[in-house]
């Protein structure tokens, strides 16, 4: 009998019933909520006269629309204010635990879940947000859902899904100096494309993945959606268990021992068969920078902007040409010659304590370049912010000319006051570089925290290995 993949084990252990069309009703262990995709779901419950089936299995956080500046004043934007106040009211009415805008635990939902122990190995977890795949780093089956599905989980704690195919992405070898988890996932997307993972559940494995911290694994799983997959995961090991140990909502005592014994089985069997296997070698991965309007438009920092005329695929060549026109770039331009206007260190991809330490190590004792109009550091949560301030990282950034902000999604997306103006170019640790993602007409270059911090100091990207 063929062994099971990690995805198979997680799926099979949560099937309530199977249907003739190949779909299955899955039990959902945890749902995370935020102010943008939950209002209609709560209103659906209200209109139907229903209550959440398991209220304690839900946690709400305000993150997308919250201002990252002074929070002693009311939220200025009327739409954002209504969404935040609506979440507050809905959570009160339905008795859902919420980390509101003034709660010290508030932050980006995909940072808060793991750090609070709300996300645990072996769980099924959903959220009305595509980057829910982040939580798969803990050996969980985690994926984003739509608002109607948010309501369905609130009402029934179940969801109908079709099982995905499986893909193993194996990264063997050791990472070179200056190469991080962000570079790994950008290199993967550059290799398989933004549609390469469509229809698959991704599992990341190999020596380089096992060597990463939990926060590095979260960065990789976070961007599974940019590779076209709804979910990505890493098998449980000692790193996973030590990360979870002592978290506020983690099991304790005998329950902890029982949980760990169960979690140890959350690995793919040696004889498990994947539908597709992709292999990269760690020593071939260099610091990455995106140059276009899709995460797959990426290259090593020491390369040049590619020429669409040299692309044999006509469709891809047209897409490259459009991207370069939007980005205001000429083919053949060294990536290190592109000047930046703004800097953003934050997002659910790279706003955890290790990310801030990585950036601060580059910034320490230096100053932001004169051509940089604004440099933001936005911690992923109040817990991260407090820890960073305890380590003095805030002073490192402030002394260098950065702004030190309150937790939130911030400049990752143009839904709050932190955004790009038309034509502005930003070096960003976030996950998407689509047209207008950070503000109408804004131009986004994705890179690791260290690379973005170095761009702030030099005014343009540099190879941090030099």
UniProtKB/Swiss-Prot annotation:
Belongs to the aconitase/IPM isomerase family. LeuC type 1 subfamily. Binds 1 [4Fe-4S] cluster per subunit. One of its GO terms (molecular function) is 4 iron, 4 sulfur cluster binding. Pfam families: Aconitase. Keywords: 4Fe-4S, Amino-acid biosynthesis, Branched-chain amino acid biosynthesis, Iron, Iron-sulfur, Leucine biosynthesis, Lyase, Metal-binding. [4Fe-4S] cluster binds at residues 348, 409, 412. NCBIfam families: leuC, PRK05478.1, PRK12466.1. It is an enzyme of class 4 (lyase). It comes from Halorhodospira halophila (strain DSM 244 / SL1). It catalyses: (2R,3S)-3-isopropylmalate = (2S)-2-isopropylmalate. This is 3-isopropylmalate dehydratase large subunit. Heterodimer of LeuC and LeuD. Its EC number is 4.2.1.33. One of its GO terms (biological process) is L-leucine biosynthetic process. Its cofactor is [4Fe-4S] cluster. It comes from the Bacteria.
